[in-house]
Structures are given as C-alpha cells and as structure tokens.
Amino acid sequence: MKRVLIPGVILCGADVAQAVDDKNMYMHFFEEMMVYAPVPVPVNGNTHYTSESIERLPTGNGNISDLLRTNPAVRMDSTQSTSLNQGDIRPEKISIHGASPYQNAYLIDGISATNNLNPANESDASSATNISGMSQGYYLDVSLLDNVTLYDSFVPVEFGRFNGGGIDAKIKRFNADDSKVKLGYRTTRSDWLTSHIDENNKSAFNQDSSGSTYYSPDFKKNFYTLSFNQELADNFGVTAGLSRRQSDITRADYVSNDGIVAGRAQYKNVIDTALSKFTWFASDRFTHDLTLKYTGSSRDYNTSTFPQSDREMGNKSYGLAWDMDTQLAWAKLRTTVGWDHISDYTRHDHDIWYTELSCTYGDITGRCPRGGLGHISQAVDNYTFKTRLDWQKFAVGNVSHQPYFGAEYIYSDAWTERHNQSESYVINAAGKKTNHTIYLKGKGRLGIDNYTLYMADRISWRNVSLMPGVRYDYDNYLSNHNISPRFMTEWDIFANQTSMITAGYNRYYGGNILDMGLRDIRNSWTESVSGNKTLTRYQDLKTPYNDELAMGLQQKIGKNVIARANYVYREAHDQISKSSRTDSATKTTITEYNNDGKTKTHSFSLSFELAEPLHIRQVDINPQIVFSYIKSKGNLSLNNGYEESNTGDNQVVYNGNLVSYDSVPVADFNNPLKISLNMDFTHQPSGLVWANTLAWQEARKARIMLGKTNAQYISEYSDYKQYVDEKLDSSLTWDTRLSWTPQFLQQQNLTISADILNVLDSKTAVDTTNTGVATYASGRTFWLDVSMKF
C-alpha cells in the first residue's frame, strides 16, 4: 500500500489534506518522499490517513478515535473500552502528547466540529441536570471520509483553540473519473468475543449494570454504509455517504435490592451519519464546494434498580459549508462560510422521580426509587466566516518566500433548555412527601464572539527552510487576548533528502468550555424546599495553554529503509480545575474555577519502514516497527479535566511518601512504552491482503486512592490525601485483518474482510480498585466486513 509522506516544512504551515488535493495551491521546497508503510506515522508533526489507510486498519466501531488508536502521539484511556462494555459504539477520548482529552480541535474540511459544551461529562446517570457530552461534535464514520490528518506537533497557525492537537477530517470530493457506488456491511456480536471478567464483577456484569455504569454481556452490532460519486453536469458533481451503526444490547429491565432480575429488554445504541459535497469546477480560476453534514447518536437506558426509569440520551449535529477557491494572478484566495449545530440531550420517559421508603413492585418489596426527570438539552450554533490568502512563491536575492495570511470569525450561540417541568421527592413511611424539588421549564443562552488573525511565511535558503508564524485569538467569553508564536525550521543536511532535521517552538491556547456559563442558567430553574442554591464563578479565568519544544529526524538507511525519530516536550500551564465551598448563611454552594492545573510531558517515537516493499514470489511484504514513549507528571486528572478538584492540594502521600502533588505521575492515559510490529502481505494475482499488528505494552500502574480501612493507609498523614500505585502486567496483543477482493469479479469489485482482534486472547488488566477488583481489556474478538463497488 502506497503512502505519500510529504516534508513537514511546507505542511506545518498548510492544510495537509488540501495540499494533497490541490498541489498547485501549496508549493513544496523539496521533492515528495514516497514510502510504503502499513500504518501511517507522524512526519514532522502530522500524520495523514488516506482512504486506503482507513480501509487497511481494523477500525473497530469506525470512529476517528479507533483510527488514531495506534498513532504513537496518541494515548487512549484504557478503562473506556473493556470486557465489560463492548456493546458501546461511542467515540473514545484521546490524549495527544499528554494533553487534556477535552482540549483537542476536531474539524471537518477545516471548520470547527468540536463540542465544547461540556465534554468532560460522559456520565449516563439519570438526574435532573445530567446531559452527557463528548469533545467530538460529529460522530463521524471514517469509512465515508476521504482522509484524516492528525496534527500533533509543529501545528500550523491556522489551527487553534486546542492544547493537544488538531484532527481534520476531509469529506470526499467529486471525481469525474471515479463514478462508483459502494455498499458495505460490518458486524460483530457478543457470541464472537471472549470477555475477561473479575469474579467480583460477574454478578453486576450478568445484571448488565452497576449503578450508573452500564455493561453489555449480550449485544449485536450491525453497521451499514452507502456511498456514491456522480457527475451531474460538465464540471459539476456530487459525492454522498450514508451510514447507520447500531448496537442492540439486552439488559436487565429491573433488578431488586436482593439482586433478583425481573425480566430483560433490548436497548439500542445508534449512530447515523450523512455526508455530501457538491463540487463545481467553474473555471480554471474558480472552484466551489457546498458541503452538507449530519450525525445523530442515541442511546437507550434504564437504571435497573429504578422501575420506569427508561430514558434516551444522545447527540445531534448538523451543518453546511460553502468554500470558494479563487486563483489570482499573484496568489490563491480561499473563502469559507459555515454553520454548525451541535447538541446533547437527555429525554426521560417520565417527568416525576420519587422514592418510596416502603413499597411493592411486582413480586419485589423494599425501597423503591422510580420514574424520570423530563427532557433537558444544551446546544451551540456556530456561524463561521474564514478567509486565507496564499502568496505565490517569490525570491529576494537567494532567499525564497511564500507568505500566507488568514482571518476567522465565529459567532457561537450557546443555549440550554428544560423542555418540561419535572420534580423529585421522597414518600416516607407515613405516605407524605419530603425532600421535594421542582425543576422548572426554561431556556437561556450565551452569545460569544470569537476572533482570529494569523500569518506565516515559508522561507527557504539553499537546503535550510524556516516557518515563522504568529496567531492572535480573542473572545468575549473569558475576554483574554492570546498570542501564539509558531516556529519551525528544517535542514536537509546533504540536500538530497537522505538526512533531515526539524526543530521548533510552538504555543497552543485552548478552547472554552461553555457549560461553565450555562450552568447557573440551568440551576436557576431549580426550586428546593430546603432553599439551597448554587453559584458558578469562572469569569476571571486565563485561557489554558501548552508550550512545545519539538525535534524530528529523518534518515534514509541504505537504499530502502527510512528511519524517523520525534521528540516532543510539552508544558501545560493555567489548566482549569475547580474548588467548591458552601456558604451556610445563604445556603449557597459556590463552585469556583481556577487555573491551578499544570503538567509536564516527554514524548518520544521511533519508526523504521521501507521506501519500497519487498517482493517475494508475487507477494509484496511491507514491514514496519514503531516505538513510542509518553510520560507525564502533573497535579490533575486528565479524565476529570476541568472538573478536577484536587489541584489545590500542595502535598499528597504517594506510595508512602509525602510529596509535592505536581511531581506525581499522571495516572490516567498512562501507557508509557509501546512497541508495535506491523506487517502487511499483499498477493495481487489473488486479491488477498493480510494485515497484522503485534503490539507490546510495558507494565504500567493503576492509581488507587486509599481509605482508612486500607492496609497501606498511614494514620500519621491523615490530613493528606493518600494514593498508591498498583502494578498492572505488561501485555502482548496481535490484531489481524484478512481481506479478499476476487479478481474474477472486476465489475462488482467485491471485498470480504475478517478482523480478529487480540488473536492470542491475552488477559490484560487495565484497572483495579482499592478492594482489588480488576477490570480487563476485551478478549479475542471477530468482525466480518463485506463491501461492493459498482
């Protein structure tokens, strides 16, 4: 499989995917380097996944997170996808170079697709105020995309409002030479996998839940896709892609306090995707794109210990964008106008939630909570205008320049709404209501203006090139003026691309979290007989930012081996966390957000791959080995993010020693050393492709907070929070994918694929509790995939 890896001195200052689509727009100082690699790896800060890469990789549920799982700059939270919850199909969180998983920039065709409403709240619990969110605004099906580019370091100035990195997904553009329809079907089910469950978890697993944590012992996943590319007139055409990903999960309908299961029901987890792009090549000077996009996610739940607690939680996002490329005599101008609606919601079947202290439900007696808490949602409408001007390359003496300038304005209309009145109360033994709370119907909004200006120049002299740039951001939410310097230099030592060194310094300011402003609006609709109130303070926050020092090396070894080494050092400053206190006089709970969070991260990767595949008896063999190491220290939990409340602790007890909290290794997304061997075998005459990944992960640690009943608890340090690390063993996993495209069916182009994940059925612990209950990664899993082009 051919991979095109383009030198980063140009691409660090340009949109990589567009540079691939339109090479005339972005001029390259050096010739492109052609390599063959099973899995894309970072090249000077960016990793480009073509549609061919996406087809090759076993992408599991088909989300962008699944695609990036093997990237050496990325770490996943290993507790998200385990043997307990394999029926879930939602995107997983990712951390890039140790940064917050809620501070990545997601884009579609260069327009923001980030959900910054309340991405740290992924709880599926039933409550009057809980609206589950996620940082990916659109739950895209990667099989419908043209390409995806991850910017993890040396990120160009046109990308902002992130701390970790940028992920830009490109929708396919009409191609008159490729008028095809593609149908696809992909499936797996619980009968096709092995689940590794701790003995102490088996009862809850078989009952399908533990409190507000949901398990999936019995599920079926069925994914359907349809895409086409059609010419409508001369120089005018359309592409479209539709998909439905559905997981049907059988869970307990009700479980009594004694653990008695009273029937089971089927619950659906669905993600729908619709993408379309109309393209008009109006002339040699003008090209227009009109893009339509939609994703809708819904998840059915009940709380198995609450009768009548059925609810639907989900996300709906849709938008449109118009792009116009104009070729001027001396420059290229791109203008983009877009609108995106991103929303999260919780809709209960009932509007009243109450608890009877003594009740009977069917054959079950005891304490009975039941009901629901109505319909609540929050959303943001983003109206975007952006423009960018790329000058043609010109020379001043022996130095060439290619500057570009850009501006962007986004108006964000954020709102939260309770669609109907609901209430909660307790019925005591005397049959009277107590603890009565009313949640009033209401709607409130925030309007935010976001302004951006940026400029950069590509400067080249002989075999040295520089990319200085600067970005300015301002918004009236936190009212901070943020200036981000970006700089990169590349040296082609022998001027023949056999030895190249890249280095740079960059600053990345993060995005806003809108829920901090919406929370008081939502809480104002609550009337409690106790008179309790809540107040949120966030207005004096600084914008969190990351400073980056990075270096990259590329070396050609002999005639056919390419080695790449990358080092990234990140310091995260002014990270948001919170503290809470209660004013007893006014019965007000005050939540105050602060900038006390900080982390330091060292990230290193090394890869070896071939410039040309090995040819043995009509078989192309593409080997690749990748080493990656990421280690972070800091005073906040990446999973908790801006809801972290421990950053005010100057000292803690860690593994028996009283230490500074910010010297403690970060516990989540903690998979420091990973080594993977990727090997593809392609037999062109038969149409067989066998792709393999053998991955080893070093032993790592799970963080446990000690209580007074734990043996390791030190009573003389009772004034401090105490933590201990428990070792989790190293792991070796083998994932394989076998695809067959029968050569005798050229007209239909049928492809049948089978994925086997964790072929060795390794039992890998990913977490443990202070009582010693372990959680394990999924065991061996089979997927079947069939597609046809015609």
Give the positions of each predicted feature.
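N-terminal Sec signal peptide and the immediately downstream disordered periplasmic leader
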Residues: M1, L5-G60, S65-P72, M134, ...
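Periplasmic N-terminal accessory/gating domains of Gram-negative outer-membrane beta-barrel systems
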Residues: D22, V39-P156, G166, K170-K172, ...
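C-terminal beta-signal and adjacent terminal beta-strands/loops
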Residues: N116, G687, A695-I714, S731-T733, ...
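Surface-exposed extracellular loop regions of Gram-negative outer-membrane beta-barrel proteins
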Residues: S123, S298, N476, F494-P544, ...
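Transmembrane beta-barrel wall of Gram-negative outer-membrane proteins
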Residues: S179-K180, T213-S298, N315-K332, G397, ...
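Transmembrane beta-barrel strands of outer-membrane/channel proteins
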Residues: V181-R189, A240-R244, L290-G296, T335-H341, ...
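Face-selective signature of the C-terminal outer-membrane beta-barrel domain
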Residues: L275-S298, R311-L478, S603-P613, R617-S628
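Gram-negative outer-membrane beta-barrel transporters
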Residues: S460-S465, Y567-I576, D583-K708
